[in-house]
Amino acid sequence: VIRACQELDIETVAVFSEGDRDALHSRLADQAVCIGPAPARDSYLNVANIISAAFITGAQAIHPGYGFLAENPNFAEICERVNIKFIGPTSQVIEKMGNKAEARKLMLESEVPVVPGTEGIISTEKDAINFAHNIGYPVIIKAAAGGGGRGMRIVQNDTELSQGLNTARSESEAAFGNGDVYVEKYIEEPRHVEVQILADEHGHVVHLGERDCSLQTSRHQKMLEESPCAALNPSLRNRVGEAAIRAAKAVGYTNAGTVEFLLGSRNEFFFMEMNTRIQVEHPVSEMVSGIDLVKEQIRVAAGERLGYRQRDVRLSGHAIECRITAEDPKKRFAPSVGKITKYHAPGGIGVRVDSHIFSGYVMPPYYDSLLAKVICHGHNRAEAIQRMQRSLHEMVIEGVKTTLSFHRSILSNAFFKKGEVYTNFIKRRMGEG
């Protein structure tokens, strides 16, 4: 975000917690303001302190990034009330799409395919069991206000469903302050495909192609993303893209967002959810489209029109992103904290690294374990894979446990190279757990 602003000649203010005092973003910005102690609830989730920092520095807009308050409708609404531009969709859109059950209803009305599921929130265990008997096991329990894999349970029978409802509700309440859940048919061995959307405030909506995000841990955490999806033929790709645009128009979407789908074995696809923010994996779409999504977010928020239509979007080559995290794959991806004693980023043509770490940086225990995103672009998938393999062997991160070796193993896996990638790939092909 800071780099995009610098290229647009916009002054920046970084907010940081006491635990992030030495973080790179606070050094790169024109100004930096401490907004509280290290725990996120006292700093990055502290709306009053963030708004105060904006007032003190005279900031006219806030970019929420892709975590913490990025999909919090209350925060967006407060920004609107105090005349600070929230760089993202309106608070009403965030609230509407943030409730997964309500989003399902809206998609049904807009003729966007959805996975067969309950109409609204499950209120009783009996209702859930009746639905499961009608549709057939397995089913998946989902948090209505959820995301990031929390509040989700795949169940195979009545006993697991009863237990899963209680667990999912508890997780959802703890994570989102909302224990509501709903139930869907579980699509076995699907691909997770998402479409990058960009919409201005004048009614124009385009998509920048799809990303295959199927490589996930058992906790539904994405590890690798690529674009385009190897499983989509031109006809299916057009249908998925058109469905994503219908979804965005149905809710009156503005700014950058992502429409997520499950792709079944018979080329059927179903709406899952819409992420009302920029995604961690957005560089994949930037690499194949040549469009700087963060710059576009800022321009759209300033009221500018998109300078192109769908017919003008040209996607070229293949891009892959690996999320390198401070986790131990041998211990079910347990977080690792400590000091980065040595860091070397890969380089070369078609290689991009987005990272906040450096030699001597101390990983705080309070936040996400992401260390770096390595993104490689090639003329085709084979070249992108080779370039990523070379880059990950060149990359050095010492001092904490990382997923570097695990990512290297994924890239050398024969099934991955053939494009046979589904959401259970890591468990089935890599032996997770």
Feature locations, PLM:
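ATP-binding N-terminal substructure of ATP-dependent carboxylate-amine bond-forming enzymes
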Residues: 1-109, 122-130
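Structural detector of well-ordered beta-strand residues that form the stable sheet scaffold
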Residues: 13, 63, 85-87, 115, ...
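A structural signal for short, well-ordered beta-strand elements
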Residues: 43, 96, 121, 154, ...
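Diglycine-centered glycine-rich loop/turn motifs
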Residues: 91, 116-117
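A polyampholytic, Gly/Pro-enriched intrinsically disordered region
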Residues: 104-115, 136-138
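ATP-dependent carboxylate activation and anion-phosphoryl transfer catalytic cores
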Residues: 1-7, 32-33, 55-57, 73, ...
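Acidic/histidine-enriched active-site and ligand-binding environments that engage anionic O-linkages
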Residues: 130-140
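A cross-family glycoside hydrolase active-site/sugar-binding cleft signature
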Residues: 15, 65, 117, 184, ...
